[in-house]
Amino acid sequence: VRSHLILNMIIDGKKEAQSLRDAIKKEIDSLKSKNNKVPGLTVILIGNFAPSQIYVKNKEKNAKEVGINSDVIRYAKDVSEQEVLKKIKELNNNEAVSGILVQLPLPPQINKEKIINAIDPTKDVDGFHPINVGNLSSGYNATVPCTPLGCLLLIKKIEPNLSGKHAVIIGRSNLNGKPMAQLLLKENCTVTITHSKTKDLKTECLKADILVVAVGVPN
């Protein structure tokens, strides 16, 4: 975020994340005391892809810290698509499971679109289901992918009022760029999305009050 008042500011993401976990823990403790219930998160992990193992381990750790019941269902990388779909249907009907997350990427024999569409939209933790994507695009309440939502929370720590700001987003992925644009539009920003085919990217970036980079590669 560019401002005549703010020249350089390092945001401590770990500190902000801890504050958010503390707030969530208080909410869950309150829910438990009133209703004797806590949210339940089930993660489906397929194969032994190292980064996915790390992501899931961190999800388990954070869920435990805030008081969420966490379960990980692990499958070998050659599991059939039908078996995973059957498990998702079972989780959709399980009242103890309030959130379902299928860790990506998936092996080639499994259709990602089918898997995402099979998840109950109200239990879609990633916000990838077409209903959640459509609701976000329409400005309605929706489950939002965690990376753009976290980015917005950090931006608003610096500048709570984003109305009228010019935001430039580098990257148009369904995971980051597109939902980030929708979130900033909801904050009444003027949003420009740039990508690998954008001409004169430097000029576009220089116009920005807010610059969000989500391309996954350096330089």
Language-model features: locations:
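Anion-binding alpha/beta catalytic cores of soluble intermediary-metabolism enzymes, centered on
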Residues: 102-162, 180, 218-219
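Short, well-structured alpha-helical segments in soluble
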Residues: 83-95
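Positively charged, low-complexity intrinsically disordered leader regions
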Residues: 7-35
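Glycine-rich phosphate/diphosphate-binding loop of Rossmann-like nucleotide-binding domains
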Residues: 46-60, 142-219
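Redox-cofactor binding/interface segments in oxidoreductases and associated redox assembly factors
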Residues: 99-102, 213
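Conserved hydrophobic helix-helix packing surfaces used for dimerization/oligomerization
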Residues: 39-41, 167
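Intrinsic disorder/low-complexity segments
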Residues: 1-6
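Short beta-strand elements in bilobed, periplasmic/extracellular small-molecule ligand-binding domains
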Residues: 41, 63-77, 191-193
